[in-house]
Structure formats: C-alpha cells, structure tokens
Amino acid sequence: MHSSYPTITGLGLVPTVIEQSGRGERAYDIYSRLLRERIVFLVGPVNEQSASVIVAQLLFLESENPDKDISFYINSPGGSVYDGLAIYDTMQFIKPEVSTLCTGFAASMGTFLLTAGQRGKRYALPNARIMIHQPSGGSQGTAADVEIQAKEVLYLRERLNAMMAERTGRSIEEIARDTDRDNFMSAHAAKTYGLVDEVLETRAALGASPHLHDR
C-alpha cells in the first residue's frame, strides 16, 4: 500500500477509504478498513443486527490470526440482554484477547460488554460516561405470561449481577445495591469501581499496554 486518504461519499454516509497500490485502487468503508487493523465497533444500541455483525467480526478475526489481540471500541446506550450475552460469550470463547475502550457513553449492556474485555486491557477515555443498572422488561399478555416474564427478568438480574461481580471484584450484594437505579459514573469513578482498568488521556498512555500498538 503506497497511500490512503479518506473521502466522504455523501452527506450522512459512512466515509470511504481509497487505497492505492501497484495493482490500482481499492475502496473500503471506514469500518471495514479498521476491521483489517483488528478494530471492532459497537456504536448505538445492542440488538440482533449489531450483535450478529460483531460476533461475525470476532470470529473472522480469530480465523485470520488467533494469536493477535482484537480492539473493541464501545459507544452504546445498551439494549437487548440476550444479544449482549451473545457478544459477551463470543468474546470469552475466541482465542484472541479482546481489549475494550469506551468512547463517549456506555450504559447497561454497553457497560457489561466494556467490563468483558481482557483484564488489564479495559479502558475509557477521560470524558466517557458509564452507567450501570438492573435489566428491565415489559410484560404483556395473561397473568401467567406476565409471571413467566417476571421470573426471567429476575433470573437475568441475578445472572448479570454475578457476572458483573466477577468482572469487577465487587460482591454480588454491592452490585445488586449499586444497580438498583441508574448509576452514572465518570471514567475515573468507573476505574475505581472496577469496570475499567485504565483511563487513557492519549494514545501515548498505552505505552504500558503494547497490545494496542501491535497491529
């Protein structure tokens, strides 16, 4: 590759990167180009569509090189617990270590996935905001249907509390108390709580974490 430069193909569209080489030009959308650098993004809600794309990207990057780290950038208000757990389980299942970085805002399942990164490799930028709370669900139908859904929400709450406790080093009782209502934190407060390992001011701060330089 001799050179690359960004060009916006249209207002509101994803930028395209044009790479020039001896073989000519090749165009990539910016996210596909960054995927080649083993960078995966979650931007927006956690849902079936975003989860299927992220799971596929993680599996693809593992097949490309099972020994090289993957970087997962998160700016998400959360969303579906089930779809979030699909991403979480895949992160733990694959061989490459996955580092996580919060840019902007991580809440609910977004925060859960932030904590799911490899220990020592979970980061937030200094002005990121991070929020934890208990899962919620709306129930409709007969009384029996509502009861079934309520039991499922309680199961998910207990399961997620246990997993969050394991990822943060906090007790299950602490997690249950602190997630009873929306609980917003600064990046530094999230570090103190155990949701992330470091708050990064600049890329140079990654000097102690060379895995993000090794692409």
UniProtKB/Swiss-Prot annotation:
The record's section on SUPFAM superfamilies has: ClpP/crotonase
A GO-annotated cellular component: cytoplasm
Q: Which domain of life is it from?
A: Bacteria
Localization (cell): Cytoplasm
- Annotated keywords: Cytoplasm, Hydrolase, Protease, Serine protease
Q: Which reaction does it catalyse?
A: Hydrolysis of proteins to small peptides in the presence of ATP and magnesium. alpha-casein is the usual test substrate. In the absence of ATP, only oligopeptides shorter than five residues are hydrolyzed (such as succinyl-Leu-Tyr-|-NHMec, and Leu-Tyr-Leu-|-Tyr-Trp, in which cleavage of the -Tyr-|-Leu- and -Tyr-|-Trp bonds also occurs)
Q: Which CDD domains is this protein grouped with? A: S14_ClpP_2
Q: Where is the active site?
A: 108 (nucleophile), 133
Q: Which GO terms describe its molecular function?
A: ATP-dependent peptidase activity; ATPase binding; serine-type endopeptidase activity
Oligomeric form and interacting partners:
Fourteen ClpP subunits assemble into 2 heptameric rings which stack back to back to give a disk-like structure with a central cavity, resembling the structure of eukaryotic proteasomes.
Q: Name the protein family.
A: Belongs to the peptidase S14 family.
Function noted in UniProt: Cleaves peptides in various proteins in a process that requires ATP hydrolysis. Has a chymotrypsin-like activity. Plays a major role in the degradation of misfolded proteins.
Under what name is this protein listed? ATP-dependent Clp protease proteolytic subunit 1
Species annotation: Paraburkholderia xenovorans (strain LB400)
Q: Which gene encodes it?
A: clpP1
